[in-house]
């Protein structure tokens, strides 16, 4: 019923879905560790500030390291205002509250999120965005599952100064933009997307005016940059 701040006095264990209602701001301060039970989610309808620092990052991990004991996802659904995630390490996530919609460890549906200095590893699908907007910078993503590391469908996207470590799995792109207008993909490093039909950057579904500049792409099995389905880009 009121805005809440969580500090790093001790680890917090999330045993079930954590809902942030539309009239609430939850702030998680530097150094906090969240240990997530199997299948539990952070569901944001209001606003979330995850405020790690370089010296004291925030860790969001599975409660148990037992194989396949994965937690859900951080899900933004029609969130009231822009949320921010900075200097945070995310691991052990799967899919969100509605797996048919919340595909990513960070899933944003018709919401606005700003992400910086985030490390995502050992997840099923790093980031999925549908409408709204995403700005992500200075972040590192890796994954061993078939997915697109950042998949944006509709809305606005700024992806810059990020590093993507690929794998040998098939049908996996580092960045996939669909029906995005005025997106920017800039100064990223993309390594070793070696599975069949895998691209570094894939622009499709009538995306328009996408700026792609100063990206380094090493060893993409299919295409470094793929543009199709009536899309337009500036490279």
Spans of model-derived segments:
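Beta-strand/loop edge motif enriched in small/polar residues
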Residues: 1-235
């Amino acid at each position: 019923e009121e805005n809440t701040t969580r500090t790093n006095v001790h680890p917090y264990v999330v045993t079930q879905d954590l809902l942030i209602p539309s009239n609430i701001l939850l702030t998680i301060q530097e150094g906090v560790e969240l240990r997530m039970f199997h299948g539990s989610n952070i569901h944001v309808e209001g606003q979330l500030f995850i405020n790690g620092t370089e010296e004291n990052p925030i860790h969001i991990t599975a409660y148990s390291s037992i194989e396949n004991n994965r937690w859900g996802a951080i899900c933004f659904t029609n969130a009231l205002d822009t949320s921010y995630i900075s200097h945070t390490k995310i691991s052990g996530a799967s899919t969100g509250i509605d797996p048919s919609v919340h595909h990513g460890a960070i899933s944003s549906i018709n919401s606005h999120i700003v992400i910086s200095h985030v490390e995502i590893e050992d997840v099923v699908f790093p980031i999925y965005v549908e409408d709204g907007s995403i700005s992500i910078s200075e972040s590192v993503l890796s994954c061993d599952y078939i997915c697109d590391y950042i998949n944006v469908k509709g809305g606005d996207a700024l992806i810059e100064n990020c590093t993507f470590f690929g794998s040998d799995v098939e049908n996996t792109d580092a960045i996939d933009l669909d029906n995005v207008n005025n997106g920017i993909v800039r100064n990223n490093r993309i390594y070793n997307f070696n599975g069949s039909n895998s691209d570094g950057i894939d622009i499709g579904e009538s995306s328009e005016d996408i700026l792609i500049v100063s990206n380094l792409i090493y060893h993409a099995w299919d295409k470094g940059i793929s543009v199709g389905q009536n899309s337009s880009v500036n490279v």
